From Swiss-Prot:
Its EC number is 1.3.1.-. Its cofactor is FMN. It catalyses: a 5,6-dihydrouridine in tRNA + NAD(+) = a uridine in tRNA + NADH + H(+); a 5,6-dihydrouridine in tRNA + NADP(+) = a uridine in tRNA + NADPH + H(+). The keyword tRNA-binding applies. Keywords: Flavoprotein, FMN, NADP, Oxidoreductase, RNA-binding, tRNA processing, tRNA-binding. The active site is at C100 (proton donor). Signal peptide: none annotated. Belongs to the Dus family. DusB subfamily. This is tRNA-dihydrouridine synthase B. The gene is dusB. The lineage of its organism: Bacteria, Pseudomonadati, Pseudomonadota, Gammaproteobacteria, Enterobacterales. It comes from Yersinia pestis. FMN binds at P16, M17, A18, Q70, K139, N200, G201, D202, G224, R225. One of its GO terms (molecular function) is tRNA binding.
Length: 321
């Protein structure tokens, strides 16, 4: 699949997830077979551009793979400025967020709230596309509510504005993450526009990935929550798409190696004073399958020292072996 002049190595993309798809996680997903990994959402508000939080969320020129930054906001001029700043710092693709269902984002008329205002959507898309000389993509939901699904209208508008790829999550904003994603709307959009369409939502295993690709005709898949604690899902899916066969479960020793490396990267990236806090949620996700009771996770979450976290994980896996 191509986005502008960029050729992805495969059709699997790691979704932007706030507080999760930071630089260490993006690099891990890339190493585990993702064709591209999108950054955490960055606000277009200029008041926060120079904060430590925004600085850490920005991509860096030495990152592996295609550097794709997602921005969010509701002011066309601010969005254009945010796009220019991120391109100057190394972004090779700009993704616009019009799919986030979070209340704090929607209250500011950003994220999926914008789907209720096609005229403003057009202004934002046009402003960003005209502001930068890199491909601009868009991520949306199927609409604001099941009664107001307008993804076909938004998709046509996006194509006319020069958007070069469109990701659609198969739920409306009012659905949040409840129920099951539906793919009829994604299929309808794919049959309507000529730009690449990326399907997103509830793609949890290789069989589901194959089924969604076949049903929707999508050009690619975006995987989010299913990669939490299981970044090797990209490798599993790609192997199945290529061969029709499932890979064996990840050996416990390999899980330990990946987890240890991920936690060390988090400690290095955020510093010892913050890295150990960020590491807690990732460890919890990794160990869901291997720690059915919460005792170790509760013990681990009480640790407030980076080196002690690594020692605790080593001891934990030794006991499992």
């Amino acid at each position: 699949m191509r986005i502008g002049h960029f050729q992805l190595t495969n059709c699997l993309i790691a979704a932007p997830m706030a507080g999760i798809t930071d630089r260490p996680f993006r690099a891990l997903c890339h190493g585990m077979g993702a064709g591209m990994a999108v950054s955490e959402m960055l606000s277009s508000n200029p008041e926060v551009w120079r904060t430590d939080k925004s600085r850490l969320r920005m991509v860096h020129v030495d990152e592996p793979g295609i550097r794709n930054v997602q921005i969010a906001g509701n002011d066309p001029d601010e969005m254009a400025a945010a796009a220019r700043i991120n391109v100057a710092s190394g972004a090779q693709i700009i993704d616009i967020n019009m799919g986030c269902p979070a209340k704090k984002v929607n209250r500011k008329l950003a994220g999926s709230a914008l789907l209720q205002h096609p005229d403003l959507v057009k202004q934002i898309l046009s402003a960003v596309v005209n502001a930068v000389d890199v491909p601009v993509t868009l991520k949306i939901r199927t609409g604001w509510s099941p009664e107001h699904r307008n993804c076909i209208e938004i998709a046509q508008l996006a194509e006319n504005c020069g958007i070069q790829a469109l990701t659609i999550h198969g739920r409306t904003r009012s659905c949040l993450f409840n129920g099951e994603a539906e793919y009829d709307s994604i299929r309808a959009v794919k049959q309507t526009v000529s730009i690449p369409v990326i399907a997103n939502g509830d793609i949890t295993d290789p069989h589901k990935a194959r089924a969604v690709l076949d049903y929707t005709g999508a050009d690619a898949l975006m995987i989010g929550r299913a990669a939490q604690g299981r970044p090797w899902i990209f490798r599993e899916i790609q192997h199945y798409l290529d061969t029709g066969e499932l890979l064996p479960p990840m050996p416990l020793g390999e899980v330990q190696r990946l987890l240890d490396g991920h936690i060390r990267e988090l400690h290095d990236f955020y510093g010892p004073g913050k890295g150990f806090r960020i590491a807690r949620k990732h460890v919890s996700w990794y160990l869901q399958e291997h720690a059915p009771n919460d005792q170790f996770r509760r013990t681990f979450n009480a640790i407030e020292d980076a080196s002690e976290q690594l020692e605790a994980l080593e001891a934990y896996f030794e006991n499992l072996a």
